[in-house]
Swiss-Prot record:
Listed name of the protein: HMP-PP phosphatase
Residues noted as binding Mg(2+) in the record, renumbered to the chain: 8, 10, 212
Molecular function terms, GO-annotated: 4-amino-5-hydroxymethyl-2-methylpyrimidine diphosphatase activity; magnesium ion binding; phosphatase activity
Active site residues per record: 8
Keywords: Hydrolase, Magnesium, Metal-binding
Top EC class of this enzyme: hydrolase
Family: Belongs to the HAD-like hydrolase superfamily. Cof family.
Entry-linked Pfam families: Hydrolase_3
Lineage: Bacteria, Pseudomonadati, Pseudomonadota, Gammaproteobacteria, Enterobacterales
The UniProt record lists the keyword DNA damage: no
Reactions listed under catalytic activity: 4-amino-2-methyl-5-(diphosphooxymethyl)pyrimidine + H2O = 4-amino-2-methyl-5-(phosphooxymethyl)pyrimidine + phosphate + H(+)
Length: 272
């Protein structure tokens, strides 16, 4: 039986309205009662995740910023990695040929250059929000990640520009169809989970993980049991064809799967 369960948030543990369902919260509590370590592995900021954890009364490790930070149960930093300052400076100051909006994250929060109220819908549960600022004024040596938000086709074109300019100095991934992330080289949820599991005296084989987007690929592919959401990006399902696909986040499929796993561990699981 797995000893650690790692969960992506958006599109996985959270429902489409960006909230946790009652069944999901109850199932997470059951996991803790079985002494299974909980880990939330997300692109969201630790400041936001601490607020969410506080409303749940659950002990969980946090992998935030898509693997750029790991925090202990007590809130201590176990691991941190920032973008190479030259990479951050280039991305923030270059005139990219795109209509996508740029978002910069550091330990102080989420920063963008203009008001985009629609993006706050994903954060109604926590109240976390961006700060509007001149992005070029942000110190390049304190940036954990940079995101671009826009339609998928424009982000694909932007990814080509970023790859040509940055070459092999950063890790690019889609955390959603409308969000392209620029991360430190070698930084992802999978590598962060490897650091955390080693810290806990576990192996990745002792872990299970759930996810729906390409920023979950390394994590899902490296654990003992990786589960893909039924609402996942098609690219993720194609990249990991050997993994099981469960139900939709809107149906609290993670809770559905885990309830079966806890109650009938030796019986095959049938998705909703």
């Amino acid at each position: 039986m797995a000893r650690l369960a790692a969960f992506d948030m958006d599109g996985t543990l959270l429902m489409p309205d960006h909230q946790l369902g009652r069944e999901t919260i109850a199932t997470l509590s059951r996991l803790r009662e079985r002494d299974i370590t909980l880990t939330f592995a997300t692109g969201r900021h630790v400041l936001e995740m601490r607020h969410i954890l506080g409303t749940l009364s659950l002990d969980a490790y946090l992998i935030t910023g898509n693997g750029t930070r790991i925090h202990s149960l007590e809130g201590d930093v176990l691991y941190r990695q920032d973008l190479d300052p030259q990479v951050a400076d280039t991305v923030m100051h270059h005139a990219w040929d795109t209509g996508a909006s740029m978002h910069v994250f550091n330990d102080n929060g989420w920063f963008t250059g203009q008001e985009i109220p629609a993006l706050l819908q994903a954060h109604v549960y926590s109240g976390f929000r961006y700060q509007v600022i001149d992005i070029k004024s942000i110190p390049a040596h304190q940036v954990m990640k940079i995101c671009f938000c826009g339609d998928h086709d424009s982000l694909i074109r932007l990814r080509i520009q970023l790859n040509e300019t940055l070459e092999e100095r950063a890790h690019l991934c889609f955390s959603a169809v409308d969000c392209l992330e620029v991360l430190p080289l070698g930084c992802n949820k999978g590598s962060a989970l490897a650091v955390l599991s080693d810290h806990l005296g576990l192996s990745l084989a002792d872990c299970m993980a759930f996810g729906d987007a390409m920023n979950d690929r390394e994590m899902l592919g490296s654990v003992g049991q990786g589960l893909i959401m039924g609402n996942a990006m098609p690219q993720l399902i194609a990249a990991l064809p050997h993994l099981s696909v469960i139900g939709h986040c809107g149906h609290q499929a993670v809770s559905h799967f885990l309830t079966h796993w806890l109650d009938n561990p030796h019986l095959p699981y049938s998705p909703e």
